[in-house]
Amino acid sequence: MDVATWAKSYARAWVEMDPEAAADLFTDDASYRSFIFDEPHIGRDGVRSYWSEVTSTQAEVQVTMGRPIVDGPRAAVEFWTTMENSGEEVTLVGCLLLTFDDDGQCRSLSEYYEFAEGRLDPPAAWGAL
């Protein structure tokens, strides 16, 4: 699987709030760091557990992924997400730093993001190279 296909699958799993589909994108021993200073979620079980927790408060999720920037097994992908989180409309914008194995499974993910209140649209040319 190439990085663009992986990113689309990640976005679909988020929109569908599907922890199993998300976990399937990762290696058995993957590291998923959702907060850079916290310990990572480890393996598919860790990803599944994390996604089950965070998506439980989300609704009306819309995700747009930017065009990946790829350098060998490493990639960076921006995301722009609007949703209801705990009943409040929010926009979540960020970047995923990813490392992949030879089969296109993600071995590591580090996530950097910011929240804003309300549903905001991306600026012109967002996510393009």
Model-derived regions, located:
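A beta-strand edge to alpha-helix "cap/lid" segment located at domain peripheries
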Residues: 2, 48, 52-129
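Solvent-exposed, amphipathic alpha-helical segments
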Residues: 5-13
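Hydrophobic alpha-helical segments typical of transmembrane helices
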Residues: 6, 18-21, 50, 94
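Short alpha-helical functional segments enriched in proximate histidine and acidic residues
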Residues: 13, 25, 54-57
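Short, well-ordered alpha-helical segments enriched in acidic and aromatic residues
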Residues: 16-31
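A short gly/proline-enriched turn/hairpin at secondary-structure junctions
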Residues: 31-41, 57
